[in-house]
Amino acid sequence: MRIIFSALILILSFSTVFAQRGVPEVREDVPLDSIRLSDPAILADEETQTYYMTGTGGLLWESKDLRTWTGPFKVAETDPGSWMGPDPMIWAAELHQYQGKYYYFATFTNRDVVIDTVKGNTIHRRASHVLVSDKPDGPYVPMEDDVYLPPDIPTLDGTFWVDKDGKPYMIYCGEWLMNWNGTMEKIELKPDLSGSVGEGKVLFRASDSPWSRERDEDGNSIPNKVTDGPWLFETQTGKLGMLWTSWVFSDYVQGVAYSESGTLDGPWIHEEEPITPPNFGHGMLFRTFEGKLLMAVHSHKSEDGRYIRIPHLFEVDDSGDRLVVIGPYQP
């Protein structure tokens, strides 16, 4: 009896550890609007004819038709001895296929390391980073360099683009918490994406946008300070654009900017009005296996002090010089 009791305690101990680590229960045939996920990004993988959806939380969902999904699966494997620590928060993960491999761009936060305190806000060690895998469903593991961006500045929401010079780049946000005017920046990556080259360059600032607004202490309307969720695209006419998200007072909203030079260096000209309805944002674009261009975003609402975010799809048209949102898409 004592042996059985000891074995039971051991099993319960392992169960507690797994529960604390947040090992997810895999579910099948889950409708898209039943999934709670911030920053959804979908890779349509031609080889497997499968859609892979990532986002905040370091988890992955799989679907054959965009209607129902299987998951979530844990696919990100980080180095506990790196700056991320043993249990980093993972935000805004994206999958990109490049030169025969799959890359996992995401934001990692080490809550045990504080780099600064500004205006009463504690700023933790946070940065965009890249993992790699030979398969779209992972596992995604670290590469050569464990630091892509400066450790003393919080960065987030890194995405991927190959510019007209043929070089790969990470485009990311300099978080507003430190300078109260968030930035959009680029940094060159090594040819195999295993690290960065040189220093980052500011492309534009949150205050450059005509549509994102907030109120100061006196209630005056001023430019919003947040930059969030960049995604690069090129229209069928060759126009380089960037989706990005901020706020219009209390609404979470997505806008778009276009590069006059057709390169990452811009200058970036912002559209006067947001491209999506209020409280839809952090979007990205992908084509279905049938060739339809879709935008994945999450809806945003606050409920009892918590954010509720659900993935949604919009059909879009890129046949002209400007991206046009047609409307909600139901698979």
Question: Where do the language-model regions lie?
Answer:
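Bacterial Sec-dependent N-terminal signal peptides
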Residues: 1-21
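Carbohydrate-active catalytic/glycan-binding domains of CAZyme proteins
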Residues: 19-331
